[in-house]
Amino acid sequence: ALLYNLVNLEMKPGDKITESDLCELYGISRTPIREAILELHQQNMIDIYPKQGTFVSYIDTAAIDEFLELRNLMEQSVTQLACEKLTPDNIAYLRENIVQWKHHLKNDNLAKTQACDKEFHKYIYCACGKQFWHNIIRENAYQFDRIVILMFSSINTDKLIKDHSDMVDAFEAHDKEKAYEISLRHTKRYIEHFDEFLVKYPNYFKK
């Protein structure tokens, strides 16, 4: 629950948090709260400063750049595999995912919209036998997830949906070059909005 609140920006970057407040919020004892704080500190989602307190970490664009570099390296291989391995049933599942995304977007359901996005990418990795790769990505994606929340809540996401649709078309056509090209285009859409978010949410980002 604490990680969910951090990722979804219900707790803002820079906010001070205390064990007592979290115990009251979640209705649990200090021990699991303390353990969660230490784990999230290791994941760079919480900053701990002796004699100052515990704070929600700022969004680190350098860390996100490094994460996206790793993701692009993995997706170069995964998109190639998807063009070889995905069955008609796999393709149908991905197309239904896109339909569901559009439905949730129309109903302004941000949580389910983001869930569809995550499921789309996870499904491709798993269908290609790369569950472990996907786990590595998810374990390091929390900083990036906050950018996704900003993107989904403030930017028209029609182009993101089109990327997914075009990607499925490329998989179905076994067009490896096109699939990877679309994957890179998809990632760049988030990077393109960094400067806009820095202006709109200056207090969210690491200086």
Whereabouts are the PLM-identified features?
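Short linear motifs at protein or domain termini
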Residues: 1-84, 195-207
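Residues at helix-coil transition
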Residues: 8, 129, 172-173
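Juxtamembrane/interface motifs at transmembrane-helix termini
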Residues: 34-35, 39, 85-88, 112-115, ...
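Mobile beta-alpha loop/short-helix "lid" or hinge segments that flank ligand
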Residues: 42, 46-47, 140-142, 156-158
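Conserved amphipathic alpha-helical segments that form helical-bundle/coiled-coil interaction surfaces
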Residues: 67, 84-149, 160-169, 178-189
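Charge-rich, acidic-biased intrinsically disordered regions
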Residues: 143, 148-149, 173-174, 202-207
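C-terminal effector-binding regulatory domain of bacterial HTH transcription factors
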Residues: 176-207
